[in-house]
């Protein structure tokens, strides 16, 4: 093996290691995993996501009009109730679609505020 081929192989291995370690922090779950002692599950999880989304909205400036703000909150609440129903349906199903999701990240593992805000629905000011 020539020196340049060896260098390329080492560089590729290092790149794969860096990519794997940066994505390795993702939570994965088994279907029968028990909740984390500091995990948030059920209705408190939906409330935590709602609070995180409202906090993110207020930090980003929100909307200038009260009516628009109320409409955005209604849309977010509808989205969060749909998310909660979907989580219940997926937990009841023996064949889950994937090992990741809000229940996996925040109930069966412990999640932080950034992970909670990943589940906020995209809401634009003009969609009211």
Swiss-Prot record:
InterPro entries, per the entry: Insulin-like, Insulin-like_sf, Insulin-rel_pep, Insulin_CS, Insulin_family
Tissue/organ expression: Expressed by the venom gland.
Propeptide residue span(s): 59-89
Example GO molecular function: hormone activity
Signal peptide start and end residues: 1-24
Serine amide PTM positions: 127
GO cellular component assignments: extracellular region
Principal subcellular localization: secreted
Family the UniProt entry places it in: Belongs to the insulin family.
Function, as annotated: This venom insulin facilitates prey capture by rapidly inducing hypoglycemic shock. Intraperitoneal injection of this peptide into zebrafish lowers blood glucose with the same potency than human insulin. In vivo, when applied to water, this peptide reduces overall locomotor activity of zebrafish larvae, observed as a significant decrease in the percentage of time spent swimming and movement frequency.
Protein name: Con-Ins F2c
Source organism: Conus floridulus
Organism classification: Eukaryota, Metazoa, Spiralia, Lophotrochozoa, Mollusca
